[in-house]
Design a protein with these regions (language model features):
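Short cytosolic juxtamembrane segments of multi-pass membrane proteins
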Residues: 2-5, 314, 403-417
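Alpha-helical membrane-interface segments at transmembrane helix boundaries
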Residues: 11-15, 42-46, 50, 272-289, ...
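Hydrophobic, regular-secondary-structure patches
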Residues: 43-126, 130-136, 151, 168-169, ...
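Short helix-coil transition/hinge motifs at the ends and kinks of transmembrane helices
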Residues: 69-77, 111-113, 200-205, 256-263, ...
């Protein structure tokens, strides 16, 4: 039941020594503030880093040929391993754990740019030769028209799908590129679609500066024979990409007469492995944040307990008078506990709100989509649970002072100075 006199007494007691009360409350509030800010900052950094994985399947890897480092099968070291379309068919038949296999080529090699002409406009873009299944590995969103299909591959059609950046540079805003033509290395292609990606920043702009053409058309139009620049492979659900990668490498080593112990003949980039490393890193950061935050909170709660002990000692005579006038032990205990809970609760709430406001300010300052720090947020349920735990801890912090208070004999308390 609400007792106005009791609450007035609580606030009056805390206000008797404002500096002591402020410093104690600051210790508690600072602990919750630090916990929220550190967790939000960790989440913001994690969001920024993992954003790079939103455009690709994390259970995938990329594999390409390099130079052998060991002699094997009559071949000397330093031999360039050139993968072909035959390797694609072999992987498809002999590695059942590979769900998606996408052989890829890029005009001019990896990272190469090529002059593309449309009317009086010309720019340099990346030209990719791909199969339709590349969409299962890379997060490509077709915004208008369509993507490469099986008939394009079968009939070696001269069709192209352009990125939004290509559209911006070669076409007016009001123009629809679908149905128009562009020229790549003297070969005309009909535009059948426009795509965008799910990645922001520099990487998103780079990906959207690509032009996709059918793999078989690429081979014929640019005299690429049956060579494959690299493979993009996605493993089946439940099968680690590292396992599939090893199966593919073992097969290719046999097909290309490469020493099984030669680790340099094939290069790879395993997204699943990299993603797991990053998740493990941020898992460790989160544990560290909790340890530091909880340690700071515990220090604040201990401070509350110590201050309440001091307050009880200062009020020894007052407690003796109350006991002599018939105050029950529960009345004394509840008074001390309420003072501890009020001090902890108010300090925790202020720390909580200050932390959330700070995160909002940081989010506004780091609003650049190219930033590696994105959306520093914390889970509201977790925040409220932390506040409740803090208040319960505040009650616990008042138990020792409260037990000291009721242990005082009324006669001895009345004699206290």
């Amino acid at each position: 039941m609400f007792d106005l006199d009791r609450w007035q007494e609580i606030f009056s007691t805390l206000a008797k020594n404002p500096l002591r009360t402020f410093l104690t409350a600051f210790g508690v509030g600072w602990g919750l503030f630090m916990l929220i800010v550190m967790m939000g900052a960790g989440n913001g950094l994690e969001n920024g880093v993992t954003r790079e994985f939103t455009n690709v399947a994390t259970n995938s890897f990329f594999l390409w040929g390099q130079r052998s480092s060991k002699p094997y099968g009559g071949f000397g070291p330093g031999r360039q391993i050139r993968m072909t379309e035959d390797d694609y068919f072999s992987i498809r038949e002999q590695v059942p754990d590979a769900e998606t296999i996408a052989p890829r080529n890029q005009l001019g090699g990896f990272g190469g740019g090529n002059l593309v002409v449309r009317g009086n406009q010309s720019e340099s873009f990346s030209i990719m030769g791909d199969y339709p299944q590349i969409m299962e590995v890379e997060g490509i969103d077709v915004l208008s028209g369509r993507f490469i299909n099986a008939l394009d591959i079968q009939e070696k059609r001269k069709v192209a799908i352009i990125g939004t950046r290509v559209k911006e540079l070669l076409f007016e805003e009001s123009e629809d590129p679908v149905g128009d033509y562009l020229m790549i290395n003297g070969v005309y292609f009909s535009i059948v679609g426009v795509f965008g990606t799910r990645t922001d920043g520099d990487r998103g702009e780079r990906d959207e500066s690509r032009i996709y053409v059918p793999f078989t058309t690429f081979q014929k139009a640019f005299n690429n024979g049956n060579q494959v620049g690299w493979f993009a492979i996605k493993s089946k659900e439940g099968v680690p990409a590292t396992v599939v990668e090893q199966e593919v490498v073992t097969l290719l080593q046999r097909l290309h007469s490469v020493d099984p112990d030669d680790r340099r003949a094939f290069g790879s980039f395993n997204l699943e492995e990299r993603y797991n490393q990053i998740q493990g890193l941020f898992g460790g950061i989160n544990i560290l944040v909790w340890i530091v935050g909880i340690g700071t909170l515990v220090a604040g709660v201990i401070g509350v307990s110590n201050i309440m002990l001091v307050i009880v000692k200062e009020r020894t005579k007052e407690i003796g008078v109350r006991r002599a006038l018939g105050a029950t032990p529960w009345h004394i205990i509840s008074q001390i506990l309420l003072e501890s809970i009020v001090l902890t609760g108010i300090a925790g709430y202020v720390g909580l709100m200050t932390g959330l406001i700070t995160l909002d300010g940081v989010a506004l300052m780091a609003g650049d989509e190219n930033s590696m720090f994105q959306h520093p947020q914390v889970d509201l349920d977790m925040v409220l649970q932390s506040l409740m735990v803090l208040i319960i801890a505040g009650a616990g912090a008042g138990l020792i002072p409260a037990s000291r208070a009721i242990a005082v004999h009324p006669v001895e308390a009345l004699r206290a100075d």
